[in-house]
């Protein structure tokens, strides 16, 4: 049996005091309700990599009523809460932090691209439903298991190998937005998409057609918020994901040079990058992608304004 890794010291050393204070209040609420509570998501991955949590998100999984636990948490901390009862999740905005409580669950997909059907589960099933092994680890938070790492699917090994790996062969057909996430994490972390996962991604690239434009727009927005989004866009172009947004899109040396100029001249933003990405499209093509991705009025205006600029 592998040796149990405990990250209690790393939590206390790596996270800022206000984050630790919020986690401890969540632990107290969970103990009062006798609910198993776990730290999950990118924060666990980044702790193991020794990297800062760049987005100020604290994600926790609860074996039980996550919304009820979030209500008790908010009574202690304040903040603005948004609950989604269908998935038994709650998001709390508090100062600079976003705290997510989610019921540990099992997900099933009736068809490719559909939103999942959710049933209560355990931390084991909850980790298995996640996108990649490096994001499928948890840290126990209840006092009896505080700091214990739950790595059931080889996440630590893939961190060491610098691999982005799916947990099962149907991952991309279940949720094709994972194709964009694989590319984004690969470029952000300096990893490589694991060879078998890469073959699955290429096989299932057309599954992006099963995903609504609104969800694809969200993934594109996340890419455009990266420090150097041209890297992920070039990889998406290479793997065919970019063309699933619109066949005329290209991420070539011209685009990379324009993104670099935007950063040097202080104009870099996700809106400006979107305008550059679509700059070589015709009016008809811009209308098509605007409708398909359901772009906001602000995004549509940025596209047209940036076409008139000299850069």
Question: For the regions a protein language model found, what residue spans apply to each?
Answer:
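Catalytic cores of the polymerase beta-like nucleotidyltransferase superfamily
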Residues: 1-311
């Amino acid at each position: 049996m592998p040796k149990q890794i405990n990250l209690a010291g790393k939590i206390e050393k790596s996270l800022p005091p206000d984050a630790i204070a919020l986690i401890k209040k969540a632990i107290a609420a969970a103990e009062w309700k006798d609910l198993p509570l776990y730290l999950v998501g990118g924060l666990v991955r980044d702790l193991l990599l020794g990297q800062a949590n760049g987005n100020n998100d604290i994600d926790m999984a609860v074996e039980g009523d996550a919304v009820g636990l979030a209500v008790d948490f908010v009574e202690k901390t304040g903040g603005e809460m948004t609950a989604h009862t269908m998935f038994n999740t709650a998001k709390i905005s508090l100062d600079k932090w976003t705290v997510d409580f989610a019921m540990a669950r099992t997900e099933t997909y009736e068809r490719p691209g559909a939103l999942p059907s959710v049933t209560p589960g355990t931390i084991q099933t909850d980790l298995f439903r996640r996108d990649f092994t490096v994001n499928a680890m948890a840290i126990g938070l209840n006092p009896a298991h505080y700091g214990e790492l739950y790595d059931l699917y080889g996440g630590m090994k893939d961190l060491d190998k610098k691999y982005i790996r799916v947990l099962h062969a149907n991952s991309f057909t279940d949720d094709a937005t994972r194709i964009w996430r694989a590319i984004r994490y690969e470029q952000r972390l300096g990893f490589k998409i694991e060879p078998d996962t890469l073959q699955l991604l290429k096989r299932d690239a057309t599954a992006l057609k099963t995903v609504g434009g609104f969800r694809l727009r969200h993934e594109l927005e996340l890419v455009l918020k990266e420090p150097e989004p041209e890297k992920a866009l070039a990889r998406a172009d290479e793997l065919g994901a970019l063309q699933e947004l619109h066949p005329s899109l290209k991420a070539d040396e011209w685009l990379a040079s324009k993104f670099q100029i935007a950063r040097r001249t202080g104009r870099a933003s996700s809106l400006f990058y979107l305008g550059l990405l679509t700059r070589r499209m015709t009016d008809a093509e811009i209308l098509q992608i605007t409708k398909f991705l359901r772009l906001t009025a602000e995004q549509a205006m940025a596209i047209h304004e940036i076409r008139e600029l000299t850069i």
